[in-house]
Design a protein with these regions (language model features):
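NAD(P)H dinucleotide-binding glycine-rich loop of Rossmann-like/cofactor-binding domains
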Residues: 83-161
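Mid-domain Rossmann-like dinucleotide-binding core that forms the NAD(H)/NADP(H) cofactor-binding site
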Residues: 129-204
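Short, well-ordered coil/turn residues at beta-beta hairpins
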Residues: 33, 216-218
Length: 318
């Protein structure tokens, strides 16, 4: 089969990759569409020493697996857990000590014609959700994880730093809490999309220091982190939603003096993410910049790296 293979920070299209043979408890999924995200771009930069097929945001058709899933559209949670380690026993499978992670850690990913994933990771796509929209399930779930980690209500002042793909989804999900929300970024056209949805926006240099209860950094760069940090009141909460390819320097003393809570935030719940798509409470269509066939995957990555581009989707089959 064809797939986008990453090795030594070099991405190439391979045409002779064996179709995976699912072990017991896993299903074979034929990929329909997959989305390129910030983590994929960071992998190429070397943030994690991964070799294999990359990609983790996908929609596919089950070809081998339980009868009730055959020929059904599915999306999949990316962490494959062992079920027996201390984190799994605590109900924290995303931190399984023996986990593999789709397209990121020791498991071939979604930028190929097929993948294998544990059956328990798969979720049916509602009939009224398009295949293109369903590719956003994983990042919407990641956005929702914030509300799994911290309670946010109408009296909270919340800042989102970053107007990219994830920032747009986080903004939409946080807006549903009725909090006092501000989203800042560097791209007026991206901020306009959120303003049209009734979400308050501004440029990054307009943030008032020490005003917000909660700030969310979606940028993955030191400048975004510093903006999010300066915006927090004492005993505020800083949530990090993006991976960093390099080291991050910070003033640890100020975190101590202001008693700042620092939260890393990764994968989230798929069921409510699919519900938001099915009820159209989150809009994703405007985020799609372009579609590329898998055979033009390298060109798709160049497009995804382009400044101002939001989501690029790969089409594996119809």
């Amino acid at each position: 089969m064809k797939g986008l293979w990453l090795e030594n920070n070099q991405l190439e299209l391979r045409t002779n990759i064996p179709i995976p043979e699912p072990p017991p408890g896993e299903a074979l999924v034929r990929i329909l569409r997959a989305g390129i995200c910030h983590t994929d771009l960071e992998l190429i930069k070397g943030y994690y020493p991964y070799t294999g097929i990359i990609g983790h945001e996908f929609v596919g058709i089950v070809e081998q697996g339980p009868q009730q899933l055959i020929n059904q559209r599915v999306v999949g949670e990316i962490n494959a857990a062992c079920g027996t380690c201390r984190f799994c026993r605590r109900g924290q499978p995303t931190h399984c000590e023996n986990r593999t992670v789709l397209g990121i850690v020791n498991r071939n990913g979604a930028f190929a014609e097929y993948l294998s994933l544990p059956i328990e990771n798969l979720h049916l796509v509602p009939e009224n959700v398009s295949t293109a929209a369903a590719t956003f399930t994983e990042p919407i779930a990641a956005a929702l994880e914030i509300q799994q980690q911290i309670q946010i209500g109408k009296d909270d002042r919340v800042l989102v730093v970053g107007d990219g793909k994830l920032g747009q989804l986080i903004a939409q999900t946080l807006a549903l809490t009725s909090c006092e929300l501000l989203v800042v970024g560097r791209h007026k056209e991206k901020l306009t999309n959120l303003s049209a949805k009734g979400i308050k926006t501004g440029l990054a240099d307009s943030v008032t220091d020490r005003y917000f209860d909660i700030s969310v950094d979606c940028t993955g760069n030191p400048e975004g982190f510093n903006i999010a940090r300066r915006a927090l009141r004492p005993r505020g909460t800083l949530i990090l939603k993006s991976t960093y390819a390099g080291n991050l320097s910070l003033d640890a003393s100020s975190l101590v003096v202001d008693e700042i809570t620092l939260i890393g935030s990764r994968c989230g719940p798929f069921v409510p993410a699919l519900e938001l798509l099915a009820t159209e409470k989150v809009d994703v269509q405007y985020l799609i910049d372009s579609y590329y066939p898998l055979s033009q995957g390298l060109e798709a990555f160049e497009k995804a790296k382009t400044k101002g581009v939001l989501k690029v989707l790969l089409e594996m089959s119809s």
